[in-house]
Amino acid sequence: GDIGTHAHNLTRFITGLEVDEVAAEVGAIVPKRIIHDFGGAMLRFENGARGSFWVTQAAAGVENCLRIRVSGTKGSLEWMQEFPQALTFKPLNAPSQNRTPNGPGTLPLSARCTRLVAGHPEGFPDGFANIYSDAAEAIAARRAGKQADPLALYFPNSFDGLMGVRFV
């Protein structure tokens, strides 16, 4: 199986370091499962730094809990996939700092990969895509003389537009 390969690749990308030594255990937690669904590793990098990770596909109720923490002599960085808009920098002997995409201190590589202005989540355009998709579905259904899926009818209509104009 591939368990642990993604964590290894991400570790190499983030740190820029190659792994020299590994002590690991992999296995199956779920009874009768024939593939590995758990792995834990202790790592030694080419520069002598140490690292560890554990990975599992058998944590009940957990939704792909990817969490990364890199610690060094000047502080630590932490990122969690469940809160992708925040990178926490924890400098030694100073308060934690939350960094956001395109916010103050954004590095050029990060800015190049960020499509929106600071304060908007990366999924922001998806909300508009959902509105346009639902509106198109409703229009197509009406033209075909059919009923649109009731769940596709939660988009702004002309009355909402009128209320917006009246508000202004």
Q: Over which residues does each language-model region extend?
A:
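Alpha-helical scaffold segments in carbohydrate-active enzymes
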Residues: 164-167
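Rossmann-like dinucleotide-binding domain that binds NAD(P)(H)
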Residues: 1-50, 54-63, 159-162
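C-terminal glycine/acidic-rich active-site capping loop/insertion
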Residues: 13, 21, 40, 45, ...
